Amino acid sequence: MAVRALKLLTTLLAVVAAASQAEVESEAGWGMVTPDLLFAEGTAAYARGDWPGVVLSMERALRSRAALRALRLRCRTQCAADFPWELDPDWSPSPAQASGAAALRDLSFFGGLLRRAACLRRCLGPPAAHSLSEEMELEFRKRSPYNYLQVAYFKINKLEKAVAAAHTFFVGNPEHMEMQQNLDYYQTMSGVKEADFKDLETQPHMQEFRLGVRLYSEEQPQEAVPHLEAALQEYFVAYEECRALCEGPYDYDGYNYLEYNADLFQAITDHYIQVLNCKQNCVTELASHPSREKPFEDFLPSHYNYLQFAYYNIGNYTQAVECAKTYLLFFPNDEVMNQNLAYYAAMLGEEHTRSIGPRESAKEYRQRSLLEKELLFFAYDVFGIPFVDPDSWTPEEVIPKRLQEKQKSERETAVRISQEIGNLMKEIETLVEEKTKESLDVSRLTREGGPLLYEGISLTMNSKLLNGSQRVVMDGVISDHECQELQRLTNVAATSGDGYRGQTSPHTPNEKFYGVTVFKALKLGQEGKVPLQSAHLYYNVTEKVRRIMESYFRLDTPLYFSYSHLVCRTAIEEVQAERKDDSHPVHVDNCILNAETLVCVKEPPAYTFRDYSAILYLNGDFDGGNFYFTELDAKTVTAEVQPQCGRAVGFSSGTENPHGVKAVTRGQRCAIALWFTLDPRHSERDRVQADDLVKMLFSPEEMDLSQEQPLDAQQGPPEPAQESLSGSESKPKDEL
């Protein structure tokens, strides 16, 4: 024991000597002027109109800050690798040594700590050389240097750099009206290209993620995958860098250091917990973008969610399973993802699906994060050091029971106060609503009651009878013969490929589905694999529904096809006995519905550009499959529609119309599902190709919409029938 203690003491003395030597060595190691001094020089040059001086100083300030950041990262990463926390797990003292064992363990721990500190001191240099005040750090975070630079570049006729600097500043300060005016001015100048408007401070992981999501939303999964995978790689790099930058000096929060009085272990605890808090908050920092008021929720897990869908859409089920299982690491009880996994198991086989595991990088990330959370919640419970968990996926068992009870009590108090305030506000709102509701309802009904255009079509239910707004049910849109012909088309076309591109989620394993898009049907007709006239009928019927929707809802802007397909769903008989799921759970077509909070977030992966939706039924000889509207809680059913040949349901795609489809429990349900947009930029590319193919294949006479003649456009609004569509009274992810 004496020999071991002597070795430790010798090591500690060597560390102290190395640290003092590092003081001398490092002073010459940092020769760059600090960012705050360079920023001050730049502002002074700006004040006297020295534009080249502004450019020189501000560019150097940005480079200096970047160099400091790189130095911290390099030093902390290298020293952590060279001097890890290592306690000898195999060393266990004998009973005779027990009295001194604890002291030796402490010396071993602090010996490693001192060695790493000496390494950092030698690598970083004097603390004063790389410290910025909180105010100066804020200036750089606000991208203030680019505000000065854009003016200076403009003054010295460096237009391309001026545009980039202005855009970079505006991305970080989207409310800055003067910079918006500058950018508008730059756009009018000759010689300015779209590529000049670039963000010089963009984070690679966020750039790749946003690009991947945009491609996914534009129904280009093949192109989206490499960007989403790159976003993951860049995320983990940025995450480790962010964590390393957290290992700075202790923040005393203003002048609290004057009263700070802690012993050795309390001081270590305070600083270490502050560092852990910072590391956990890297989740929020990396999920933030200046263009958004709030960070992306569940940012890292959402990567695997998008990838799972994208891999599914391109037919790579193995990768889809891996991403689904990785997502389930964070949300093991997610109903939709578990259904997706069951679907993949049915496609790939149970054994093969079991052999695919979640990604190791995500497993390690989750394990480390949970261990840190345990320490942070323990410190919150015992020492009262607050910790706000940035993740929604943290298991409840990580939080100490006493803290759970305390948080539950606080939440209940907050909810009670909120409810009391809400009740008062609701009483006021009710009084106002009662006075305006009747006039608004009359206005909406009058607005949406346009002509149905074609003979034989009858209005069955309007918004009032459907207990909502912007809703309609029509009968007689197509004939029985046309229903049968289109149903046959689906069954024949499916043998040449299901044509089902662009769906946002795998479907229930309790039903088989197959379908065909308009363009695919026409191509198969051109190749002689399906009757060409049937494919042409399909094309004409979709155009007919589009015109009816435009007319009935009295739209001032034309509707464009966003996505359309003819699809049949067949119940698998042997799995219907204990079935509890829907064909499609309740959702909203252009936003992500959170039924618990009654909020629908209009952002990808939702198809945010969709404005109106319609479904045209081809048959009713099956059990189940009823379409239903609900409130935002996804539980309160407001109306239900029973499918039958020629019946169409139309509605606006927003939060006013959450809807779902009940399970098909026997037989086959066939329908044409259509989504429309008012924005021509999101017009379906397949539809444009279909239009061109129809012009090539058919004469102008054959291209007429149908042999039916439109009714007089000046006719009065049709009157709805009064009976319930489902034959009974209405009782209180992305196909219709």
UniProtKB/Swiss-Prot annotation:
GO molecular-function terms, A-Z = iron ion binding; L-ascorbic acid binding; procollagen-proline 3-dioxygenase activity
Name the family the entry cites. Answer: Belongs to the leprecan family.
**What is the protein's major site of localization?**
secreted
- Implicated disorder: Osteogenesis imperfecta 8: A form of osteogenesis imperfecta, a disorder of bone formation characterized by low bone mass, bone fragility and susceptibility to fractures after minimal trauma. Disease severity ranges from very mild forms without fractures to intrauterine fractures and perinatal lethality. Extraskeletal manifestations, which affect a variable number of patients, are dentinogenesis imperfecta, hearing loss, and blue sclerae. OI8 is characterized by disproportionate short stature, shortening of the long bones, white sclerae, a round face and a short barrel-shaped chest.
Protein name as annotated: Prolyl 3-hydroxylase 1
Annotated signal sequence is 1-22
Catalytic positions are 669
Its recorded reaction(s) are:
L-prolyl-[collagen] + 2-oxoglutarate + O2 = trans-3-hydroxy-L-prolyl-[collagen] + succinate + CO2
Could you list this entry's UniProt keywords, alphabetically sorted. Answer: Coiled coil, Dioxygenase, Dwarfism, Endoplasmic reticulum, Extracellular matrix, Glycoprotein, Iron, Metal-binding, Osteogenesis imperfecta, Oxidoreductase, Proteoglycan, Repeat, Secreted, Signal, TPR repeat, Vitamin C
**Co-factor requirement:** Fe cation; L-ascorbate
Q: What residues bind Fe cation, as annotated?
A: 587, 589, 659
Ranges: TPR repeats: 35-68, 143-176, 205-238, 301-334
> A Gene Ontology CC term for this entry?
nucleus
List the ranges annotated as motif Prevents secretion from ER: 733-736
Q: What is its EC number?
A: 1.14.11.7
- What is the organism field in this record? Homo sapiens
